[in-house]
Amino acid sequence: MTTDTLKDAPAVAVDFESFYGKDCDIKSLGQWNYLNNPNCDIYLMGVVGDGISWAGHPKDFDWSLLHGKFILAHNLSWDGLVLAKLARDGVIPSHVQFAGGGCTANLSVYLGAPRNLAGAARELLGVDVTKDLRTWMKGKTWQDAVEAGRADDLREYVLRDAQTCFNLWQKHAHEWPEHERELANLTMTAGWAGLRIDQKLAEHAAAALERVMWEARNDIPWADGDVAVLSIKALGEHCRANSIPPPPSTSEDDPACEAWENKYGAQFPWVAAMRNYRKANMLREKLRVMTERIRPTDGCMGYGMKYFGGHTGRWSGDARFNVQNLPKGEMFGADLRGCIVPRPGKQFIVCDLSQIEPRVLAWLCGDTQLLDQLLNGVPLYEAHARSTMGWTGGNLKKENPDLYALAKARVLGLGYGCGPAKFVEVARTMAGIAISQQVAARTVESFRSSNRKIIALWNRLQTDFRRSSGNAFVVELPSGRKLTYRDVSSSGGWTARVERGGRRIPFYGGKLCENLVQAVARDVFAESLLRLRRVGVDVVFHVHDEAVCEVAPGTDPHEIERIMSITPDWLHGCPLAAEAVVTTRYCK
């Protein structure tokens, strides 16, 4: 179905109920595989609109009633696929055409409410919506419900959900700007279209990972029994048997875990084996999901991505395969990013906004000295070194690569209140340099003393936040959008709720500044996506500030760079830049 917005078309909400059970649900299978699973019976449908209130099997509905209507659903990403399948199967007659579609789950998160229907209804309508019946239906068919005397309850349930969706739209749709609706729809339709997967490469990579896991398993003492290889209990027992402390965690992203592995890896081969097994297993699982979700119809894999996945408005991953968090490069003979390829006759242009957040931060705090250098073509990290680190030479990256790396670490790591201990790790991961705690402390002090405008922005945000105690702290963004911190409180530390009815989160000046910068950068990137769409460029997915465009061969990458580096009117004076590469595989 189309999701283009058509104003003034009457809105009608729909809700579908389908069989789900163990290993037969969207989370396990992905939307396409679940919808086409023989056990996925769409047994009930609710329809609510002005003059319409109906519940029953989709085959029994008079679909002509929805011709020319604007279709609402609380999860249109799913319900839209159901409607498309019903049309392909002939349940919806070919002459029935919808005016467009809107998703009230996306509307809800834009307004700061929970994504789920019960939470959205509670926070935006003030009503309680129970999902107990849906829980009861797990593993049960429509016939099971009939035999249990719950058929009428289910009809009331599906009607109530459709009515709640309709009420959410009627009450709050005017608060959702058209361009944000377009962004939500682009996110959804890109996920429907999916990504083409090089299945042979994915299978070859999976085989390589299996070999790595087999070799690692041979070096793990407890792996030859019935105990799971990744058993935390077995790991702890073996550590104690060897008189070493167990790792503080087994998360590969935890610096403490990495430090533990580095300390004991040379002495105990099973430490490195555990690390290799864990990483290879993680990659293999991603590849398994990728290959299992390849559609036989076109060789593509549908994927999920959440519009407004966070408080700042940035997107987030969804549905077990997170396109925003794929590991870079090859590891153990597996390159997950390289498994994503253009459709036949196409190529990728991967283009990202260069250092968008530091540029936005400079603009927000009024660092005209840095901005003027950027306008004159000086690279960002060199401009920072000239402004605050005493660099007076020529090309910094060529003449003093160590200072360039430190400037990069400062720019990327110190703009939001990072302290010395954390900066040691930030410098390593973001700039590839190793520094001591002493050097980190001096660097943090130097940065703060030479970037007083950034510090002033932290302090201003923190002061205004604390003055809002007992109320909401609202930050109006340059784009006109608002960041809202609800129910600010000093009890037990300064906290607020970013989601209506959500948990409390601590905030301080640097964190508020980071949120502000990320939100502005998100709006800049969002405008880039809309501009690309309006000139016919197909963005198949995007990662943070990077757009993966699927285009015809010969498309000029410099034109993509030009489109993405246009400064919005509301950010006048902030020089943007973009960098693109042409590739036949996703590689950045």
Report residues per predicted region:
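Conserved "right-hand" nucleotidyltransferase catalytic core of DNA-directed polymerases
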Residues: 1-30, 37-40, 44-47, 112, ...
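Short active-site loop/helix that positions an aromatic residue
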Residues: 77-92, 108-111, 237-241, 354-368, ...
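Conserved catalytic core of nucleic-acid polymerases
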Residues: 245, 390-535, 575, 579-588
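Active-site-proximal helix-loop-helix substrate-binding element of RNase H-like nuclease domains
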Residues: 37-47, 51-58, 63-174, 184, ...
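Short, conserved charged micro-motifs
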Residues: 554-560
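Active-site palm subdomain of RNA-directed nucleic acid polymerases
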Residues: 172-183, 524-547
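Short hydrophobic/aromatic beta-strand micro-patches
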Residues: 548-552
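A common structural junction motif
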Residues: 431-433, 562-572
